[in-house]
Regions:
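PLP-dependent amino-acid enzyme catalytic core
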Residues: 1-424
Length: 424
């Protein structure tokens, strides 16, 4: 598989290089040179998740990684289901929270960990990543205990749920966590500064586990095929998929799936009050506002890193950006959506509720609606309990970590302090 740097097309790398390197020159994102449609999508949709995913990724990776190795990586990473649940209103929820950290990022995080371990040379690797909630847990658990790989996770202090924090800040070992005095965009800015520091990159073998890493993105392509595989065959080509969107890696993966031949009609980018993209699609003006804290904190992103990949893919395929559905919901609307979902006997959390609400608003009569449920409701127990007057029980993984002490250190949003921490 060959990939190029969107900012500097002359920089071309293999899949293994892209996984190890994370970003290209000038903070450029890597993107596949070829996205040839799959030969027989209908036959693929009849296969089990792991077998189908291995074939999709083998198609993408080509001769670089033997098919048997791809299958091995997938079978080690995808050890949990992604069920499609039909609601009373006729829409479908794709539940992506059945992995070890109860969030959709288990798919990408675990596949990336397997890839990095497989492609690792004898050099030390330091994974530096920022999280607005779910990435931290998925990455921490995927890499915990892997030899020769150290993980450093930045997160905005006081701006993720206590249970999210407990899931990745209690492990220790090769997982180090830093609570940054700032918002998620400040955390991402620190990560970008680190990747601009060539001496630092070389000294600690810097890599990223955010959705800017191509391995995470390609793994996420697979669950879009799983969603469509579980739909009635007559409904597939009419499917509209609503995607909770923060850093826009999830939507990018869906569009790649469509480019590979997945029979879906269109997508909806669902955001909270941090609505840079919906406003951009309406006005053509890219105007990020100051990030605001919301109930759906994993989407509290005003400067989504993956948006250039969306634009690049649409440019290459000749897809007009205007055909991409989008919209935002504020906290009051999110609360109302959670209550209406509960009246349908479906327990959700804020991110999924936003996707469902916008799906209902934008779905035509002849279309079939699917929305992504990206996290288990218990990961947002405080807000879900308060809004719905419930006491959501904690699943095993959350209950276990809820009792452990936090191991994070606190740092200001200053690169000099972060650099000293990394090399110290």
């Amino acid at each position: 598989m060959n990939l190029y740097n969107i900012k500097d097309n002359s920089e071309q790398v293999s899949f293994a290089q892209a996984v190890r390197q994370g970003l290209g020159r000038e903070q450029g994102l890597f993107f596949p040179e070829q996205l040839e449609p799959l030969a027989d999508v209908d036959a693929l949709l009849d296969l089990p998740l792991a077998e189908r995913s291995a074939r999709i990724l083998s198609h993408l990776l080509g001769d670089e990684v033997p098919a048997a190795k791809v299958s091995e990586l997938i079978n080690a990473a995808f050890t949990f289901p992604a069920p499609l649940v039909k609601l009373k209103d006729g829409t479908y929820a794709l539940e992506l929270f059945h992995g070890p950290t109860l969030a959709f990022k288990d798919f990408g995080g675990r596949f990336m960990a397997q890839c990095l371990a497989a492609f690792r040379t004898n050099d030390k690797i330091t994974i530096l990543t920022a999280t607005s909630g779910d990435t931290g847990a998925a990455v921490a658990h995927a890499f915990f205990g892997l030899e020769g790989i150290e993980v450093v996770i930045l997160y905005p202090k006081g701006k993720i749920s206590p249970l999210q924090e407990k899931l990745f800040c209690t492990l220790g070992g090769n997982i180090r966590t830093i609570a940054i005095d700032g918002d998620f965009d400040a955390c991402q800015a620190l990560v970008k500064q680190a990747f601009d520091d060539e001496a630092l990159k070389k000294a600690i073998g810097l890599n990223s586990a955010n959705s800017i890493n191509i391995s995470r993105l390609l793994a996420q392509v697979c669950y879009y095929f799983e969603a469509v595989a579980q739909l009635p065959k007559a409904s597939r080509a009419k499917a509209v998929i609503s995607v909770p969107s923060g850093n826009f890696g999830n939507l990018t993966a869906g569009l790649i799936a469509k480019a590979l031949g997945l029979p879906v009609k269109r997508f909806i980018a669902a955001t909270n009050a941090n609505d840079t993209v919906p406003r951009y699609l309406k006005t053509g003006q890219w105007e990020p506002h100051q990030t605001v804290a919301t109930l759906s904190n994993a989407m509290d992103v005003s400067r989504p890193n993956n948006w250039p990949r969306v634009e690049e893919l649409c440019r290459r395929k000749g897809w007009a950006l205007e055909t991409l559905g989008s919209g935002m919901r504020d906290d009051a609307q999110t609360r109302a959506a959670l209550k209406r979902l509960h009246q349908l006997d479906y327990l959700c959390e804020p991110h999924g509720a936003i996707a469902w609400d916008l799906l209902g608003e934008q779905l035509a009569e002849d279309e079939v609606g699917v929305f992504l449920c990206t996290a288990h409701p218990a990961k947002f127990k405080e807000s879900v309990d308060e809004i719905l007057n419930l006491d959501v029980p904690l699943p095993g993984p959350l209950a276990k970590h809820a009792e452990l002490p936090l191991l994070s250190v606190n740092l200001p949003a200053e690169f000099a302090r972060l650099r000293a921490f990394l090399v110290g």
